[in-house]
Each structure stands twice: as C-alpha cells, then as structure tokens.
Amino acid sequence: MATTAAYDEIADWYEHEFLGATDTGHADPLGLGDLITELLGEGTGTCLEIGCGTGVHTARVRALGRTPVGVDLSAGMLGHARARLPVARADAERLPFRDGSLPAVLAVMVHTDMPGYPAVLREVARVLSPGGVFVHIGVHPCFCGGFADRSDPERIVVRPGYLDGHRTTDSWTDQGLRDKVGATHRPLPELLHAFLDAGLTPERFAESGGATPLVLATRARSAAGTAPGTGTAPGTGTAPGRR
C-alpha cells in the first residue's frame, strides 16, 4: 500500500466531502453495501476489513452479525475509523493475525491502491480459517482504468492499455480519488489468477455501478470448508488492539 502519505493528506476531504456523510447515512451509488450483504452474508465472529479507511462499511458488517475490525496504513484515515471500529495500523502484506484465525475478510475498493495485491491475497489465505470467506469488491478491471474515459455518462471511450498493468493518476474527473492518489490496473485474468495462486477459490461473482459496471465483486473461500453459499465459516479471530 504505497499511497499512505497521499491518503493521510486527503483523509479529512475523504471523510467529509468525498463520502459526504457518516457510515450510516452516505449515498451508495455503486451499490457497495448491497454487495457486502449479498456476498459476505450473515455470520458470527471477527470480520477483518483490509484497507478499512475511515470505517465507512462498519455498520453494514455489524448488521450481518459479524464483529468488524480494520487495518489500514494511513494514520489519517484511521483517525476517523477509530470512532467506528477497532483498528490497527498495518501493511496488508503483513497482517497482524495468526494463521487460520479469522472466519471472514473483506476488501472494498482498495485493490487498485495496492501494487502488491497478489501478496495481499496470500496473506488473506494465511489468516483465514479453513473454509473462511473472503469478499473482494473492487473497480471493474474491464471497464474502469486509465484506458477508459468515462467523462461522458452516455458512453465509455476505451483506448489501448487494458492488457498493460499500469499505475496512473490520469482521471476524467477531479472529484474522485485517482487524480489524488493514483490507481493500479490489472487485467481481469491477472486479478483472478492471483486468487487461485493464493489458494482462494472464487465461488460467486457480482457487478454493480451502472449499465456498464464500475464494480466487480467476488466471494472466495480458503481451502477445506463450509457449504458454499452459507456466508459463515468455523473459527474465531483475535482482533488487533486500537492504536
């Protein structure tokens, strides 16, 4: 997560202007909350959110019966998150949890902030209990990236570049995150192979965010586990202390 300093600098803007309100009241035009409900599902025990930011998804996770905890590299973002959930400042490539200790892990709109996302997925597989569930919700690699101009709501202009892994701060708007902190693009096969290489088995997919979707979501499981579709898994996690 190489964008720590950038997020520290924009944490207040992100909380008060980009989100526009608290985790219980902000608009959700991309349908992220519904995706969390659909793919994470009801369950018990700890749910770790990687790259939790200001903790905007905390209420949704709690409503599913789970106990949210979060990690992020940005101290500025965690300054807002602490009022919502227990947090720790940590690198997602070195999670402060024991092997096989967590029944659920969640990552929402963060993989483009993590150039080492395959390493993050390996850490997810390490900390998940057998059959544990991982929900990835992220920018759709086919329709959103430096190669896709979405400035006209009626059409998307796609330029060459989809097949090239790249990082960019180019953006069609100055109201979003990309022009402030940048974004890393991975083609869809590379992203899905990273799940498989980490030992995570995708079992469900969803898209949201418009007729040409902005968001691709995946539910995957670690090896050996519960019946698909239950949304629960054995094991309990140990939450990090607040910092």
Predicted regions and their residues:
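Core SAM-dependent methyltransferase catalytic element
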Residues: 198-200, 210-227, 240-243
